[in-house]
């Protein structure tokens, strides 16, 4: 039978000073808890005895020590560490009892607490700094994944050991220890493959008992439990605002459990796909670390946390495999150490352990990240000699007062974003904090690694522009000249009687007014120009002065007119000169000088009759006054709504207000009391019911075709969210266009409000649809659809009479429907006649939208939005001719679309500054438009799962367009791609310009999206792929009868599998008569009745 023995050595003591009575210890992969105390890899409580009775803490605490285990006098295991705690117990006749706690040197980091900043360093580099600062040089990394530099990593009010554990857990690192003579090495790994393995397998012995010389394992229990099956993380980066950063990782070995246990978290604490994928897998490994575990016992001292071993001789062959020791408890007793004091019994050793299968990776428990519980003060810093230091995003560097390690320069922090009062696409407000400014810093989600500047403050050194409180009534915007003296200022004085707006420009003042300027001065105006003053007016200039006009020049005054100068006075005109006055006309003149009056001409007539010449006279218009301020509107008093009106609102499914029980009792006698109907289901908010002002429509109701006197408004950028599956992906006008014809009938002038669609199909029917409240475009099953079919009469587009008839019929139908919508307490649509003879439908705040599927076209301004009869399609486009110098109207609308990135034009100009392009402006416009399409396609492909990289259109004989994407061979294909061929767009460029445009598109994709996605999107278009819609507006190049080229960008929001849930239009009447017959009064009355019964 094997004999066991234990001994211990402590730095500075003789080897035989202490004898081991017993020990109890725990080891674990990374940190754990042992006997209520933190265990940083290992922790042993060792019971000792010594003949020396006066050992002190100075001799023991913080000293190196080594516990050794012997079998048959051979050293088989050692535990090296430092003494964390030492205690003295009873004093006997021969021995004094002691106890010490043996821990790794790593535990020293738990005694340091700090706040500091690390920049552009990997986690292994940061951990190395922490260890080396504590004099720990025995450490090693065995990592499968390359460390990624962290731009900004903050240790914030936490101990060094907590900081180390937090970073290690985030990166999936675990640590264990390798014990050697005189040292223990801290060993970091991120995969089970990197762990050390015992050289010999360990046998399993199910029948404990008898004398067995070799160590063995017994009591092994294997446990499987259901855990999280999928992890999904999400984050955001301002550098890629449209990119979702969504990462999904599915677990493996899930046959025994359901796969619906998803763990979602945001933010995921990553800013790129590489880290996102790694962090998601690490999170899943941690959440599933208890899915497959085993526990057991043994007498093998070689078993240690962080080691692998092979098990053999188990009755279940599946258990004879490799295992990883996750944690293990060791117990040893050595009574013979006190033999002289009566100690007896055999020396024993045993352990209890926890395992995972060798192919799995153990992950440490993520440590909570310190939260910054409020704003901080910091100072803006930068290089010496600079006043303003920022990057292309307007970010600055800052220094925190608590940061003891930085020098207060440009290396003190990462680039920190600055909150601005208004931030749009190349518009808004920008004020860069300057070096030395004090700023208020907050942290996104309380994360110390994500600071953002949200405010600025004055202090004792940086004082306000004007002293306070003397100038407390001033509101001031004052800047300071960069690298010079002076300032610009706009200030407002609000002291009663001293109100003033003050504007100061240190150098130049430039102004540009694109249209009119109206200025009114109700008292004096003084203008002093110390150098030149020039004024140019291309039209007329009128100067009207009720008093006197005095003009004085120091030298010469010249008045020159192309046709006439007319001088007129009510009483007299005096022209005075010191030496000479000359009046000259043609070859004749009158000259007055000190020598006399000289008349010269072909003929001089005196009192010869005739009449004097006349001038044009004053004909200028008086200046217009500027618009006044709108007076404040008083709040309207509370409105009482009758119970009958509330009932009407309920029947119309229009939320109003809750019915008052007292009002209900007053409105209805108690004998015939009516229980108010239950409130309607939650729906998009609508206007409360109002008294119906419009009369019922008559059989002779005709559309209002009067000439519009309203100025054309700016086209809004609101698109109905409730009926589109993609939220806010498209903004613009709600319009319809002819799907297969060149005929243009009109356009929707403006549209606002959450719209429910009223559509017409093939110009033959009107469909009133009332969708329910939708959630992300889902729940299409419950649409309520009512349809009135007029005729099934075809109309050729080249039949002008038939086209005109259909237009009038659709106009009448629209008018009739809008009247009914108004009766449901909604603002009506007002068809009016446009200047070019086409009708216009204005939608100013309606809850419904009318469109004629083949009857209304958005030719105006080049903007096109299409609604198909099922309400699932929307298209926006711009005329191809709109690119270039004459593109202002079209591009103005195009640039309002959220997917269009206007800044790409200036980027292209910068990228091609050294290239000789034939038409730089046209190329920049094409580049911006195409790149916007490429980027939007990549974004939607990533967001909605368009797998354009999983199929080859050519090999499958599928046309690469939206119809091809609906092919069953394409997986999960949402039809959300723009339809147009880049080759058609670049045809308007020269070959060299087209080549330059295409060359610079791909890097734009790669800078925002993954390499694979960028490659596939780019290749898709290069292979001739077009994207949803009607091609290039069904235009045939070179055909003079073909419609004008229009480049379309279409979104289809209903996937194929949801088509069956769309509303089914049911006709209430069918007729084979021509449209013209519908204007027959009797038939018109029939249709009206049908509409009324439905609506």
Curated annotation (Swiss-Prot):
GO MF term list: acid-amino acid ligase activity; ATP binding; magnesium ion binding; toxin activity
The keyword Nucleotide-binding belongs to this UniProt entry's keyword annotation: yes
Cofactor note: Binds 2 Mg(2+) ions per subunit. Can also use Mn(2+) ions instead of Mg(2+).
Location of this chain's protein in the cell: Secreted; Host cytoplasm, Host cytosol
GO process terms (BP): actin filament depolymerization; isopeptide cross-linking via N6-(L-isoglutamyl)-L-lysine
Cofactors (names): Mg(2+)
Function text: Part of the type VI secretion system (T6SS) specialized secretion system, which delivers several virulence factors in both prokaryotic and eukaryotic cells during infection. Forms the spike at the tip of the elongating tube probably formed by hemolysin co-regulated protein/Hcp. Allows the delivery of the TseL antibacterial toxin to target cells where it exerts its toxicity. Also acts directly as an actin-directed toxin that catalyzes the covalent cross-linking of host cytoplasmic monomeric actin.
Protein name: Actin cross-linking toxin VgrG1
Gene name linked to the record: vgrG1
């Amino acid at each position: 039978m094997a004999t066991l023995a234990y001994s211990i050595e402590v730095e500075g003591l003789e080897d035989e000073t202490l004898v081991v009575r017993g020990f109890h210890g725990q080891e674990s992969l990374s940190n754990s808890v042992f006997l209520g105390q933190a265990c940083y890899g290992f922790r042993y409580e060792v019971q000792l005895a010594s003949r020396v009775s006066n050992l002190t803490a100075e001799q023991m605490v913080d000293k190196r020590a080594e516990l050794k285990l012997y079998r048959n006098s051979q050293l088989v295991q050692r535990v090296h560490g430092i003494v964390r705690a030492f205690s003295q117990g009873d004093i006997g006749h021969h021995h004094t009892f002691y106890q010490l706690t043996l821990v790794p040197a790593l535990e020293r980091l738990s005694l340091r607490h700090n706040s500091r900043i690390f920049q552009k360093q990997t986690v292994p580099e940061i951990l190395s700094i922490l260890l080396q600062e504590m004099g720990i040089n025995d450490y090693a990394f065995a990592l499968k994944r390359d460390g990624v530099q962290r731009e900004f990593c903050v240790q914030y009010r936490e101990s060094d050991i907590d900081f180390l554990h937090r970073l290690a857990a985030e990166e999936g690192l675990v640590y264990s220890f390798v014990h050697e003579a005189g040292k223990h090495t801290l060993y970091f790994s991120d995969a089970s493959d990197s762990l050390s393995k015992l050289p010999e397998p360990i046998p399993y012995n199910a029948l404990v008992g008898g004398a067995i010389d070799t160590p063995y394992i017994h009591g092994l229990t294997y446990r499987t439990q259901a855990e999280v099956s999928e992890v999904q993380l999400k984050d955001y980066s301002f550098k890629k605002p449209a990119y979702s950063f969504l990462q999904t990782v599915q677990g493996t070995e899930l046959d025994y459990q359901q796969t619906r246990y998803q763990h979602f978290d945001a933010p995921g604490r990553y800013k790129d796909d590489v880290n996102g994928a790694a962090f998601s897998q690490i999170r899943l490994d941690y959440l599933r670390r208890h899915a497959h575990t085993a526990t057991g016992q043994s007498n093998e001292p070689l078993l240690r946390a962080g080691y692998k071993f092979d098990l053999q001789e188990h009755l279940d062959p599946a258990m004879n495999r490799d295992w990883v020791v996750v944690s293990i408890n060791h117990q040893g007793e050595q009574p013979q150490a006190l033999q002289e004091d009566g100690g007896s019994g055999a020396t024993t050793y045993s352990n209890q352990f926890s395992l995972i299968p060798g192919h799995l990776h153990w992950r440490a428990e993520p440590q909570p990240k310190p939260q910054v519980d409020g704003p901080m003060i910091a100072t803006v810093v930068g290089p010496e000699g600079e006043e303003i230091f920022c990057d292309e995003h307007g970010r600055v560097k800052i220094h925190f007062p608590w940061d003891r390690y930085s020098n207060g320069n440009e290396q003190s922090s990462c680039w920190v974003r600055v909150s601005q009062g208004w931030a749009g696409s190349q518009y808004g407000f920008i004020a860069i904090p300057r070096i030395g400014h004090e700023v208020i810093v907050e942290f996104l989600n309380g994360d110390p690694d994500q600071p953002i500047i949200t405010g600025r403050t004055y202090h004792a050194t940086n004082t306000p522009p004007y002293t306070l409180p003397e100038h407390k009534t001033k509101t001031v915007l004052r800047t300071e000249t960069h690298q010079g003296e002076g300032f610009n200022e706009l200030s407002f004085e609000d002291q009663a009687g001293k109100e003033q707006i003050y504007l100061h420009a240190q150098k130049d003042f430039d102004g540009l007014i694109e249209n009119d300027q109206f200025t009114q001065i109700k008292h004096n105006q003084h203008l002093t120009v110390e150098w030149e003053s020039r004024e140019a007016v291309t039209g007329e200039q009128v100067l009207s002065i009720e008093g006197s006009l005095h003009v004085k020049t120091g030298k010469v005054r010249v008045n020159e007119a192309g046709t006439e100068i007319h001088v007129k006075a009510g009483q007299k005109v005096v022209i005075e000169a010191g030496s000479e006055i000359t009046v000259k006309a043609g070859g004749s003149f009158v000259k007055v000088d000190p020598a006399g009056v000289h008349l010269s001409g072909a003929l001089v007539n005196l009192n010869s009759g005739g009449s004097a010449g006349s001038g044009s006279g004053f004909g200028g218009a008086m200046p217009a006054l500027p618009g006044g301020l709108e007076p404040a509107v008083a709040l309207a008093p509370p409105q009482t709504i009758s119970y009958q009106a509330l009932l009407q609102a309920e029947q119309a499914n229009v939320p109003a207000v809750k019915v008052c029980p007292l009002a209900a009792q007053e409105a209805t006698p108690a004998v015939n009391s009516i229980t108010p109907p239950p409130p309607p289901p939650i729906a998009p908010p609508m206007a409360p019911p109002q008294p119906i002002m419009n009369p019922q429509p008559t059989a002779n109701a005709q559309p209002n075709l009067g000439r519009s006197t309203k100025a054309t408004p700016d086209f809004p950028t609101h698109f109905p969210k409730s009926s589109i599956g993609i939220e806010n992906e498209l903004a613009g006008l709600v319009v319809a266009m002819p799907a297969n014809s060149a005929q243009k009938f009109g356009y929707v002038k403006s549209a606002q409000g959450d719209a429910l669609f009223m559509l017409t199909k093939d110009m033959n029917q009107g469909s009133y649809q009332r969708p329910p409240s939708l959630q992300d475009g889902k729940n299409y099953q419950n649409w309520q659809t009512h349809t009135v079919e007029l005729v099934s009469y075809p109309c050729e587009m080249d039949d002008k009479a038939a086209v005109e008839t259909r237009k009038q019929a659709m106009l009448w139908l629209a008018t009739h429907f809008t009247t009914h919508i108004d009766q449901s307490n909604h603002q009506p649509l007002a068809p009016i006649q446009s200047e070019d003879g086409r009708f216009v439908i204005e939608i100013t705040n309606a809850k419904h939208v009318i469109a004629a599927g083949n009857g209304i076209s958005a030719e105006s301004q080049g903007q096109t939005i299409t609604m198909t009869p099922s309400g699932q399609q929307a298209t926006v486009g711009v005329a191809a001719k709109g690119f270039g110098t004459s593109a202002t109207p079209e591009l103005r609308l195009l640039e309002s679309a959220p997917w269009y990135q206007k800044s790409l034009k200036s980027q292209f100009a910068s990228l091609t500054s050294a290239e000789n392009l034939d038409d730089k402006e046209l190329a920049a416009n094409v580049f911006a438009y195409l790149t916007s399409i490429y980027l939007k396609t990549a974004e939607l492909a990533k967001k909605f799962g368009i797998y354009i990289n999983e199929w080859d259109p050519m090999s499958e004989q599928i046309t690469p367009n939206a119809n091809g994407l609906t092919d069953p061979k394409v997986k999960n294909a949402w039809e959300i791609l723009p339809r147009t061929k880049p080759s058609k767009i670049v045809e308007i460029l020269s070959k060299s310009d087209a080549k330059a445009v295409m060359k610079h598109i791909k890097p734009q994709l790669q800078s925002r999206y993954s390499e694979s996605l960028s490659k596939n999107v780019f290749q898709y278009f290069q292979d001739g792929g077009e994207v949803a819609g009607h091609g290039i507006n069904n235009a045939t190049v070179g055909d003079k009868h073909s419609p004008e080229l229009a480049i379309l960008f279409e979104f289809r929001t209903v996937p194929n599998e949801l088509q069956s849930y769309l509303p089914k239009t049911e006709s209430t009447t069918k007729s084979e008569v021509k449209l013209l017959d519908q204007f027959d009064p009797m038939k018109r009355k029939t249709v009206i009745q049908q509409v009324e019964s439905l609506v």
